[in-house]
Amino acid sequence: MTANKQVRAVLLAALMVFSVFAGSIAFTGTAAAAATSATVSPDTVDKGPSASVDVTVNSGGANDVHVWLDLNDDGYYNASEPNSTDTAAATATLSLSIPESVSAGEYNVSAAESASLTAGTTQQEAYDTLDVVAANPADFNSATHFDDGTPKVEVAFDEAVTVNEMNVTDGETNLSQSVSVSSGQVNVTLSQVYTDDLEVTYNVTDTSGNTATATEDVTFAPIYVANESNNTAYQGSNVAVVASAVDTDVEVEGADDDNNYQFSGSTGPNSQVFVFDTDGKTLDTYQFTVGGAQKAQVDVRDLGLELTVDDLNITTKDGIEGSVSANAGDRTVDIVALDDDGDEVEDTETTVTLNGQGEADFNLSSVDAGEYTIEATDAFTGVTLESDTVTVSKAKDSTGDFASSVINEQVGDVAEITVTLDGTDTGTVTIGDYSLGYSANVTVEDDNDDGEVVLLFNSYAPKKTSSFDVDDSDDEYTVEDITTDIPSGETLDAGDYDLEVATGGEADNVATLVLEDRSTDSVATWTAPTGADLTETEDVYDAIENENLTQTDSLANGDVVVTQVSATGLEGAFDASNFDALSGTQFNLTVEQTNPGPNRDAKVLGINSSSATIIADGDNDTYFIVYDLDDVSASRTDYYDNTSTLYEVEDDDAFNATFTVLEDGDLAEDDESASDEFEVVTPELELDQDEFAVGNAAEQSISGTATVAPGTELTIRVTSDGDTQPRFLKTASVYVQADGTFSSAFDFSEQNLNDTFEVTASVDSGTADDATADGIVGEAMETTTAAETTTTEESTETTTTEESTEEPTETATATEEPTEEATEETTESSTPGFGVVVALVALVAAALLAVRRDN
């Protein structure tokens, strides 16, 4: 080889080596821009609407960082795979949301560093695994009620939660005061310590969005310990050992050498409370090591709760008596009877307080035949003791009877069947029998222990179980069966129906229910003052007694009308339905004009529950329809039609009120009617004299008459007029009497002879115009004999009272003692301190001052 060729070969070899070296350098530079590691936290996640994990990625920092959940495990990014992107950084932490649609399983979380994330992007060296597990809402761990200075209930879950609802109740009332949440620990503060059984109802959501809803029992721990202070707990109660942090280890051991009790536990996740149950534990001092450092202890003692039942074999006529005692006095103990299933027997609960010696007696009400135990519970500690079995047998002499051997009622009414019970509180009543086409068996229970049950039987709807009821809400009834051939909706026929009462499965006594034919007896018209409040039966009868509701055939327009219907057999219909539903099907009340005038149809008033108040007094077979003439309208049609032209009731209209029980209904075979007529007059007041001449003495009468309803309150004013001096004003409140008159006595003893005045009478409520008259004061007539004086006093007592009556319903004859208001006379006077001369001097001085200023 020539020298030139050798040199050329060396140069070519050097060039090849340099090319390889340069390529290696270039390749190394490209590899630096890549994700090198990825870490997923947490590495397990529950499926849920808000599940997510954090992914920390180390990279070159030159490009954006991308992570994705490799659903198909192909090492590449697919467009449908969950992903997240962050800006370029050497270390980036990204939040990756896991959709609820992702199936449970193990997946790779892949990472890559590139300018963008597109389909086909390759997983680089960085990836980690993630377990997606099936949706699992937060689990309830515990709920403990204790008092560390603040009464509270700690509720612990197995993971962090958000509280949507958290209520602590005693079964009825929400006792929660406030709620605080720390991860999976929820503290509910209460206003006090509750010894009753508590429940917690919650609705919480975990971090994955899964919701848990439930109601759980609360454990009551009356003793709270957190240090080595002298803490005492009675055997059988719970002790709350409270740590300074959640999920803290707790070691328990007996202090005595002969007590080898040891236990290792913890407060549990998201709880600071370790509950130590002393039930069955040796009486000893127990020491707690909390978190390896915190020390606490409690002395477990015997409460010595004892329960004694006086007699373990009694009858249904006897109460359960006994006594309870303990080693500590002034304690509250709850006593209750338990049936053979261990359930509390209703109405047997009682609470006793132990005296200073720790003793108390109890007496529970009688119970049905069966086997029972008595449970005593110390209210504060929850220590419970149960008695031996108490056997209760049915008293042999228990009987049922009827208060009356014959019960009379009308078809359609409600029969009151009074059942008396002796030696038992239950009995079965049979009404009728198969031969009568109707038979019903109803069991009654005397829950108020008065020895009787009043069974109500609605003969208007005998086929329905709702046709039975009891008069006292404390008593109970059960319809066992009804056997009948009566078509639906029809009443029982008139006749005699056998009654039978049985206790213990055997018939004790019998009686007879006599259903008589019903009748439509009468209609009467009454009137009351404008605005009278008549809504209940008592209101009507009180108004009649006080003469504020009077029977009439003439009433003033604007006053209240009361139509009284007397008819038997309607009580059951009114109990089962209402006036509007019954009108047109069972009966009609028509108030029709009798004087419409020539070429005009009669007015028919629209009487219904909207325009009238219906008051049913079924016990007395009386029904009141109350309406105000100002509130009802009328149509000139055969029956009231609110779609036709409507008219008002006018003065001088006359009406006939007719109540008809319809033959097409269930209460009568033929139409039965009763009616009453009344006239509407102008509301007027009239004074008895055009000019009243009174004496200058007391007890001078002012009187008049009125067409408005008796009981209407009037105001009478006596006002001085003309040149009368001094001026005066006298007023009195009076009420229209049953005969349409009114009067009041006034005192004119301070007035002068020939003083003149004006009298005005006006209604306090209504449309009647005022009545006026003149008056003059004359010389008083002297009383010459004692007899005359006595007569005057009696007359005064019947016409006046010392004070006005605030409520007109108290008495229709009450009047108010007139009140006199003196009117001051008008007199002339000069301005104090100034005369004419002084005023002139002041004017001159002012003028001079003005001139001086001008100069």
Curated annotation (Swiss-Prot):
Post-translational modification (record): Glycosylated. Cleaved by the archaeosortase ArtA at the C-terminus, with removal of a short hydrophobic segment.
Annotated family: Belongs to the halobacterial S-layer protein family.
The UniProt record lists the keyword tRNA processing: no
Acidic residues: compositionally biased ranges: 817-827
One of the record's GO cellular component terms: extracellular region
Region of interest (Disordered), residue spans: 782-831
Positions of transmembrane segments: 831-851
Classification via Pfam families: DUF7827, GEVED, PGF-CTERM
Signal peptide coordinates: 1-22
Residues linked to a glycan: 78, 83, 108, 167, 174, 187, 203, 227, 230, 313, 363, 441, 548, 588, 608, 620, 642, 656, 754
Superkingdom of origin organism: Archaea
InterPro entries for the chain: DUF7827, GEVED, PGF_CTERM, Surf_glycop_sig_pep
Places the protein is found: Secreted, Cell wall, S-layer; Cell membrane
UniProt protein name: Cell surface glycoprotein
Listed Low complexity bias regions: 782-802
Span of the annotated motif PGF sorting signal: 832-834
Keywords in alphabetical order: Cell membrane, Cell wall, Glycoprotein, Membrane, S-layer, Secreted, Signal, Transmembrane, Transmembrane helix
Lineage, uppermost ranks: Archaea, Methanobacteriati, Methanobacteriota, Stenosarchaea group, Halobacteria
Protein task: S-layer protein. The S-layer is a paracrystalline mono-layered assembly of proteins which coats the surface of the cell.
